[in-house]
Amino acid sequence: MPTKQPMPPVPPLQPLLFWETGVLLFVAGIVTARFPVPALTACALFAWVDSRTRRPLCCLLAAACVIAGWWIGEKSVPRVPQEYPAWLEKSLSSRRAVTVEGVIVGSRGLPDQRLQIILDDVGPAEKEPLPGRMALTWQDMPDVPRPLPGQRITADLKIRPVHGFHNQGTWNSEAYWHRQGVFFQAWAKQDDAAIRTSGTPSAGAELRERLRLRVAAALDPPEESGLRTLSPSSTDRNASRQAALPSQNAWSEPPSPPRREKLPSAPEQIGEVQTEEVREHSGSPAHSAAPADTRRFSRVQDGGASIIPALLFGDRYGLNTPDMERINAAGLTHSLALSGQHLAVVGLGALALTGIVGLLAPGLFLRFPAYSLIGLLSLPLASAYLWLGDAPPSLVRAALMLAIVCLLRCVPDLLPERFRRNLRPAFTFADVLLLALLCMVLADPLCLYDLGVQLSFSAVAGIALCSPWLSKLWNDGPLSFSPLKVLQGGLSPMRAAGGRFIRLLWLTLGCSVAAQLATLPLVLDAFGRSTLWFPINLLWLPALGFIVLPLSFLGLIAAAAGLEQAAGFLLHLANIPCEALLHSLRWLQAHAGLDLFVSPRPHWTAILGFGAIAVALAMRIHRDHFPHAAKRLLISGALLLSVGPLLWVHAFFEPKISLRVLDVGQGQAVLLEWPYGGRAMVDGGGLFSDRFDVGRDLVSLVLTANNLPRLDFIAVTHPDRDHLKGLLFIAANYAMKAAYTAPLEGIDTPQHDSPRPLSEAFTAILASRGIPRHTLGAGNVLPLADGLALEVLAPAPGVTPSGNDGLVFRLVLNGHGLALLPGDAEAPYLRALLRSGADLSADVLVLPHHGSAGSLVPALYDAVSPKLAIASAGAYNPYRLPSRKVRDALEWRDIPLHITGNEGEIAVHWDLKKNAGKKNILQEGFPPPRPHLSQYVQPMGRARESSPAGNTE
């Protein structure tokens, strides 16, 4: 009798069904509304790979999917209001606070003790409300109950329209907020805004807040929370409960209005994933001296205890920026973002409940499989976690996939036998993933632009594509074994257990690497930085999944049941690995340099190419050769990956000089670019915030867009925060030949006062990296290329500038002035420059001191005679820059004025193609090139009109 041949393994990645191709085309169609070229390129890729789209009927269906997606994408674009209520117009002109009230529709805790509140129907009493929602960021709130959804809030706020940073090729927080329907923003600190709440919160929000307070009370140190014994008396238990929870009417009775103080100014600008920033204020919080046992509502845990509320509720109020940066540098940020990994604890809970059911009614398993019961019981638990964690996109994705699997696999077991086969279709992982994507897109088409959604789906897809390769590598390796060997005595149980443990470590590390690789293009595109420390996931993820999360949920259940002592015991046990993690990361930072590395940001074609090649390689597993579709994917991926380098080569040889004044808020950062890859930064911007680094989060993203982190040099006109702070990150992470400054007080001239802290930090970074720093003065010339140079016009030799005065640069081409960069030079300094007789003529004038009246010298405008002027000033800045006097002086001379706060990044190009046929494209003897203006966005008329006519700053 012939032996039966074993079945060959089934390839894990099957061809997509046509409806799945339609889903991908529909999604690409939605993206077409905002990014037409990348989306249509993706559509062409799908159509070329899937041969079915060349059939007439399928081609029509595919086109219909794309058109339907485009139509939905266009209809979903938020309509930004163009007209504001009269009371807001008056407030924007006067820069004064206005008393408003609104309904709370959402709130969440942010790091550094910030509470973000989303308000609707905002406006003064009996006046027209704002057209849209408003985001209020409240830092260091006093010890009062948190404002909750459903309540009304009254506050004295300086409201302004949402405005982000508009720079070519970078993210913009403005688009993020507009997708949420938020068009206005405000900030408050402590009790400065006299915030008062009234009304009763929604039942769900109130219950969630009560649970959060119970967990916070249980996480307090034993001497503060009353957890002194494991068997407290009833009196102690009740007292502890009363100390941890607000009274029944705590949310319905508004506290007495706090004392009014000077309102904090809005920050110059806001960021994205760091989306809102509060200006630093001197002085300690007003509630810092309050005894610990009286701080019932705003309990803030230090260290690892702040991680547990983030895992349970998505509340990061107690975390601080240094710890968050260390977690990010270690590649562990995803472990705090509620997702499928956290939802796995729901499976453990469902498994425990199934075991209890089996003990109470074992006969149930004769009719209903245990695995189906586990799946069905996990659904209500997952829904509860969605509500508890405030439903972030990654958790919604995981819950949807769980629900789809249960619907397709477990629900048919509830039906009679004759219906099960027909109602239990075969499905693959791709089916589940695309169904979840379709559900989320139909509910909110704009979720496709959410970075969290993109990272979540990319990570899961990457794990699914790499898992077969991980299994194959393991099975072909020396540590693989068969359970049959254990039963036959060929392998000891201890060795088998060790093999299973090593396999678990292998899969954990492999899945972590797969998720990192799958999300790497998106991470680099969004942040321009990555980490090599992701192997720490090998230690942290098992501890998180098997210790921290289960104990945290058990502690939450105990706290909800009123078992304070048991809750405190469980939560403090869960806190041990969290504390160990933070201590380990601090040690690594101190001894091993726990830092992110800066890398080039890929062109968008590289993201598509990377995905195409990853799918093609996954299609090769368990096949003798690449299928036809995989070959097309490999060809497409290779072509797409080559686009970015080809564009870089084109830009390298392009005969063009560029001056780009970046949108960095109330600051200044100028990027100079010239042929053959020459680049230099003159100033780098800088804000008050310690969370949002202009150099790291704005300037670096511009510099690494399809380019290397490299500069020829950096120059600082003067060491003020809004010019120098952004260069600290650039100096610490970029390759460069030199740095140029004016003589620095206290460093180059020790007889002066002590040096500024930023100057000390800057020179220390340069010294540690071996970058030479040169001091410049009038008469120095920095050659950039043949015929192109940066002249130094001030300070005079032997003069150490002080205050806002510093270096004055003039960009020249064969003696023709292209641009004048005077920094923040004040009027007396500029008059001295005029008296020196230096040639100041230039096509472009970057206004001194952001257009301040203190730097207004009309004779300078006459001497420069520019074709256009640029003011680097933030929108709605508190200094009302550029001033009305400067605007009038420029208008009288017919000099066009462009403002970065209104128009975003402003780039001026000088095209040298007329000389391209010559050996030296910058040689003399040709007419000087004409400047061409490139604006990132259309001018914002409302911001331009925000300064009143009577302003004389």
Each PLM stretch: what is its role?
Residues 738, 830-904:
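Cap/insert and terminal regions of metallo-dependent hydrolase folds
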Residues 332-353, 710-734, 845-859:
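Di-metal (Zn2+ and/or Mg2+/Mn2+) metal-binding site signature of metallo-dependent hydrolases
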